Amino acid sequence: MNPQLKVTIRRDTKIITYPFTNYFKEFDKVEAVQHLFGEKTEEVLNGIKVTFYGRVGYMGVSSANGNIRISAHYMKNGDLRDIYLDIIHELVHVKQFMEGKELRDRNFMYVERPTEIEAYRYAVKEAKRLGMDDKEILEYLKTERMSEENLMSLAKIVNINVDKISEKN
């Protein structure tokens, strides 16, 4: 107990993590994931941890340990297909982390960062495999944190035909 405050504050908090496979089942059978990790797919997925946090947001990979951090709000309320594609995107970052790549290279803007381009290309390829058209993929790529200019830049980088979408509107 702190004598001045007359309270005890326990400061040894623990961030609770869960095995990836507790929440994300059958990803070892997804061709895109198998392509990422090859023969080690099951082993890698079994080794990934996920941490859910309380803030509104999406998900990302910790550059400290390679674990996936997910907004509990997004997990509960997000579009299931978006969550699936985001997991594919984040698994690319897990692989990049395992390869020792710098995930948050500040020399690049977010949409021009090589690690992000690779992850977005992978997610877009999977979106196309699911049958999503360019307009749906553009909507998937859009977030409130990304300017319209950055969205269009990213869309072009990952080969989304934004001109074709504009013509339809």
Set out the residue ranges of the language-model regions.
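Post-HEXXH active-site segment of zinc metalloproteases
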Residues: 81-85, 97-121
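Short helix/loop segments within enzyme catalytic domains
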Residues: 124-147
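Short catalytic/ligand-binding loop motif for oxyanion handling, primarily in non-cytosolic enzymes
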Residues: 59-60, 95-96, 102-105, 145
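Active-site scaffold of zinc-dependent metalloenzymes
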Residues: 49-81
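Non-transmembrane alpha-helical segments in soluble domains
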Residues: 34, 88, 120, 124-127
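Surface-exposed helix-capping loop/turn segments at secondary-structure junctions
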Residues: 39-45, 101, 130-137
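A metal-dependent hydrolase signature that marks the N-terminal structural subdomain at the beginning
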Residues: 1-58, 145-169
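Short active-site segment of divalent metal-dependent hydrolases/proteases
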Residues: 88-96
